[in-house]
């Protein structure tokens, strides 16, 4: 068997990607289920989420259950032989938490292949919806956790991060405070990643250090839960969590449910699922310190591979363990990613080709016009209330506003990633918007470096599949970095490279200071 499956449970979709490593390694299959298309009416989701107001953004975990069945059925319907899969690994949108009652473990162990997953697992949740990474409603809980461990800097040094509203720990604390009965009914708390892995394994499985880093609960250097952080977060939290499992060690073989229903080999191994950002680190080939990548998705994320856990003192950035089991990743997340791009596109009734043409028709620097595209509350910089700011920019000028939003995103990515202290000599780009060369051209010029685009935009699913392959080929023995390089290299050769224009790069070097002043003045107000 020479095929490996990666599954990515992201915000808006669930994706399967199969690699075939026989002879010439290649991506053999990509298949997705878009949540809004299949489940929008049933679960009331928009862009895969439910906006509950007051900064609360959730998603129904039963929708993810149903999506997994549908995704595997689509693979079979399209003629893909799942019996040839040697192993599966996966990724999940980070920070989201899933709350399960005491019936979950026996229900997973006794799944009937004649029935759907959703029909059998509808009753296993102690909380009907899961707070996800877009939720900003836990500021009070963040401050409480920081105070309980001895202050913001103590938590930063312990976990690699200050308390973030979207992180799992503050969300768990809020649930324990606002619904103590629901918390009492909760026998197990998982992340999106470990929950989907539990479905495939047919039992509750642990979180890995990569995704555990996004909880405010993990000792970043020991790669284990921090007793101090657990105690500061919620009562009896430790018993609701399984011990952290190494990212590179198999957690077992696939559940008989999937072998009988979809034809998986009973010996197909399941490796720990990790977060989507840590898996993208692998999927873009960032397995050596000093390499930098950008994901242009629902949110935009700039991240780098580091050999040490270097924390961001300002609290804007985050540090996670890499699922390579060796390194760390520095990350900064900008919530107004595709959200802002789509808002501008829709405001002027453009399609994506017209959006790209607007960038071609406007000069670098936009004649001095600037935008702060806070269509939603922003993570970096910390902007708690939405509000778009324009300077020397006519709201009626569609082309100028298109350029302004892209230039703002690129300038912000450069400005707020300086803490990583990693020279950006090239930028590997993934995500849906990476298909737009004009957007990438702006990033190449702002960062004054080549931008590389790859065969697939599904870097998290690819990273998961590569983790499954690497795990089967010796990862459990602590494979050295060279082994990772051999694993990722065939899949991370750039398909397209966009070189910076020196003249435009000089324009943006000056523009960066003007953007920084506008941002600071808006935040200070």
Language-model-detected regions and their locations in the chain:
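Carbohydrate-associated surface elements
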Residues: 135
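N-terminal glycine/serine-rich phosphate-binding loop of ATP-dependent small-molecule kinases
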Residues: 1-119, 259-260, 264-269, 447-451, ...
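Active-site core segments that coordinate phosphate-bearing ligands/cofactors
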Residues: 5-6, 15-18, 139, 143-159, ...
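A structural motif corresponding to the C-terminal end of an alpha-helix
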Residues: 81, 232-240
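Active-site donor-binding loop signature of nucleotide-sugar glycosyltransferases
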Residues: 33-35, 246, 500
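Short beta-strand-loop/turn "lid" adjacent to the catalytic site in phosphate-handling enzymes
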Residues: 51, 55-56, 77-131, 161-166, ...
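Structural signal for short hydrophobic segments within the conserved structured cores
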Residues: 29-31, 131, 242, 452, ...
